[in-house]
A protein has these predicted regions:
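A conserved structural/catalytic subdomain of Rossmann-like adenosyl-cofactor enzymes
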Residues: 2-176
Length: 176
């Protein structure tokens, strides 16, 4: 099944040890499977989740899709951006995404936006139908100062985006 749009907030730092045999068998399928670009460390399945989403993108080159591709917005912690040395599974997955020119933007959000954790999070925008002015580029948006304090904390969630903050971030993205 292919999708036009996908939105996700997978759990942060979830290990995939219980699915290890299945994942490694799928990896052996190469790019005919979902995990051909590589396998991340076993203690964080975020990039497996993203590879699964990428495998569900419509191919704009296929006649039946009439030039339509797909767009993905996914919220991650910093792990998919920063972990893994050169040549590691994480590094190979990121390289595969960038070499295919699918990563459109990364938006750094304020900390303390989630109930169970105060960590910084990032929205990755992924597309296989980039606008001409975005081809070969990745937009980095620092939205870490775009927040307001909540009247009452909810666990570790102390900050929130107002409508004005969302508009500002959207303008930064749109005016690229």
């Amino acid at each position: 099944k292919q999708c036009d749009y996908m939105f996700a907030n997978p759990p942060f730092g979830v290990e995939w040890k219980n699915q290890e045999n299945f994942v490694k068998n799928e990896y052996k399928s190469g790019f005919n499977g979902r995990f051909g670009a590589g396998l991340p460390r076993i203690n964080d399945g975020s990039l497996l989740f993203l590879q699964t989403m990428i495998s569900k993108m419509q191919d704009p080159a296929k006649e039946e899709n009439k030039g339509r591709g797909s767009r993905i917005a996914v919220v991650f912690n910093g792990s998919p951006l920063f972990t893994g040395d050169a040549g590691s599974g994480e590094s190979n997955i990121r390289r595969w995404i960038i070499e295919n020119d699918w990563l459109e933007a990364v938006i750094a959000l304020p900390d303390q936006m989630f109930y169970n954790t105060g960590i910084y999070t990032y929205i990755w925008l992924v597309s296989n139908q980039k606008a001409e002015n975005r081809k070969g580029k990745v937009q980095l948006i620092d939205a870490t100062s775009h927040y307001q304090k909540m009247a009452k904390s909810l666990g570790n969630k102390r900050n929130e985006l107002s409508e004005a903050h969302i508009e500002d971030i959207t303008k930064l993205y749109s005016n690229f």
